[in-house]
């Protein structure tokens, strides 16, 4: 049983370390706003992971995969949301002035907005359900009891929270934030292009 948990933990940490929308959202929020705002986003992402993992654990992902129209709606909707986030970042990057021109002003988001953005960023990637469905199909057989299944669910949740907490803490360091202030418009522009790219990829790969 310990080997099962260890295997799932290793597979999930590799998946977490692969840069994607969640990583870029947390890192960009941490350097441009604050660690607190980034952590709200981390909580939102973690809740999104709980939704996808719960759906896979209950076997509901099989229903979504068989209902092609629902799968298409989820893919297109998620892609459009990521494109919208990319557009917002690109527009913000174009409006930014050089950091050397004036003292940077950090505008904090309204309470809960970063949480919602983190949640929607994670839920907008329906490929997560394929990932979690594969994990549970490969490693969680019929011989695995309910307690172990929910133990794996808790492991995935805590691992996600821990990893993105580390990411938020690192990118919120003063040195990282000073570097961001010098290159703010380029970093935001790059992040915006990535989000738009993720969104377009979701739409055309549906």
UniProtKB/Swiss-Prot annotation:
Location relative to the cell: Cell inner membrane
PANTHER family the UniProt entry points to: ARGININE EXPORTER PROTEIN ARGO (PTHR30086), THREONINE EFFLUX PROTEIN (PTHR30086:SF19)
Domain of life: Bacteria
Keyword Transport: yes
Stretches in topological domain Periplasmic: 22-43, 88-149
Cytoplasmic side: 65-66, 174-206
Protein name: Threonine efflux protein
Its biological purpose: Conducts the efflux of threonine.
GO cellular component labels: plasma membrane
Transmembrane feature ranges: 1-21, 44-64, 67-87, 150-173
Predominant localisation class: membrane
Record InterPro entries: Homoserine/Threonine_efflux, LeuE-type
Family, as annotated: Belongs to the Rht family.
């Amino acid at each position: 049983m310990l080997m099962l948990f260890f295997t799932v933990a290793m597979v999930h940490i590799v998946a977490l370390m692969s840069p994607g929308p969640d990583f870029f959202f947390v890192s960009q929020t941490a350097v441009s706003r604050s660690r607190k705002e980034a952590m709200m986003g981390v909580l939102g992402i973690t809740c999104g992971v709980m939704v996808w993992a719960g759906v896979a654990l209950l076997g509901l992902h099989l229903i979504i995969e068989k209902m092609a129209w629902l799968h298409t709606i989820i893919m297109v909707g998620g892609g459009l949301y990521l494109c919208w986030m990319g557009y917002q970042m690109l527009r913000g990057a174009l409006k930014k002035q050089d950091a050397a021109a004036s003292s940077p002003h950090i505008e904090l988001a309204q309470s809960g907005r970063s949480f919602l953005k983190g949640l929607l960023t994670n839920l907008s990637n329906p490929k997560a359900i394929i990932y979690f469905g594969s994990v549970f199909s490969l490693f969680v057989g019929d011989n695995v009891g309910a307690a172990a299944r929910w133990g794996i669910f808790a492991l995935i949740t805590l691992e996600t929270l821990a990893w993105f907490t580390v990411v938020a803490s690192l990118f919120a360091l003063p040195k990282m934030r000073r570097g961001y202030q010098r290159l703010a418009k380029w970093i935001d522009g790059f992040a915006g292009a990535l989000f738009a790219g993720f969104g377009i990829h979701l739409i055309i790969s549906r």
